[in-house]
Amino acid sequence: MTLITICGPTATGKSGLALDLAHRLGSIILSADSRQIYKYFNIGTAKPTIKEQQLVSHYLIDICEPTEILTLAEYQKQAQSFIQSPGSQTDVVLPTLLVGGTGLYIKAIVKGLKIPRVGPNEKLRSQLANLGQKQCYKMLQQVDQVAVEKIHPNDVVRTLRALEVFYVSGKPISQQQGEDLPNYPILQIGLDCDVEVLGERIRDRTEKMVEVGLVEEVKCLCEKYGEKLPLLNTLGYAEMKQYLAGDISLAEAIKATVLHTRQFAKRQRTWFRGYPEIEWFDGNAPNLLDKVWERVREFTRILAEKTQE
């Protein structure tokens, strides 16, 4: 088992690089994108095209209906099944490529996060939410002091999740968390660009998405699932939904999408820069593929030498 991750801010060229590397390695690509797991959300999520999926096998995309929820634990389980037992899933030989910008997905794999196996309980969450955040936080203080020290008093989502895990499993969430590092080699590659260059790439990509049918995609999704579908409030879709509602012009929707995407990229950069194991490359470098390929070959050569010892 060997894993190569390719991470970094959006629009840095992760998917293209992964496609080239996977083709050279004869490997598969696992998506680490929290929106590409959903069917029908294609253009706005920059999902690999049918042609790209035919060139290299992609997994963990289109595995959920837009109305479903995939927990982090479920994602981790599915990803690990490919990484640890690729022969049972495909005819492709490792290394496996894990590619995307959802930091928590990648962390769940490379850090081996221990995640409570408690699924969402909407009825319980609703009952707790009706009590108000202040009361819920007091309840959490009584049952899990360790979790309280890590959760801000105003963090409704994490407070409800901690209480949900406790009441469903009978054990504090803090006792069900931690890390269990994988026992296989991992090479972590990160792509980034100069801020202004990345801004231009984001603008170009957004305009391209609109050209190839993003507005039509959003319109169809609204008609099929209703405008209140949570996924339609995410980056790119929310802005185009505003345009379709007549609240803003198309130019304004594009401008807002670019701005929000740049803000998102900044948050992604902050997240990934917190992990010193990641080896960074300039996503705008003309010889990017050659540089990364050289590092990958070095990585695989060292592993081969260790295996022969």
Curated annotation (Swiss-Prot):
Enzyme class: transferase
Keywords from the UniProt entry: ATP-binding, Magnesium, Nucleotide-binding, Transferase, tRNA processing
GO biological process: tRNA modification
Spans annotated as Interaction with substrate tRNA: 33-36
EC number: 2.5.1.75
Reactions catalysed, as given in the entry: adenosine(37) in tRNA + dimethylallyl diphosphate = N(6)-dimethylallyladenosine(37) in tRNA + diphosphate
Top-rank taxon, per record: Bacteria
UniProt binding sites for ATP: 8-15
Membrane-spanning parts: none
Feature type site, description Interaction with substrate tRNA: 102
InterPro entries on file: Dimethylallyltransferase, IPT, P-loop_NTPase
Pfam families to which the protein is assigned, alphabetical: IPPT (PF01715)
Function text: Catalyzes the transfer of a dimethylallyl group onto the adenine at position 37 in tRNAs that read codons beginning with uridine, leading to the formation of N6-(dimethylallyl)adenosine (i(6)A).
Family indicated by similarity: Belongs to the IPP transferase family.
PANTHER family in UniProt: TRNA DIMETHYLALLYLTRANSFERASE
Protein name per the record: tRNA dimethylallyltransferase
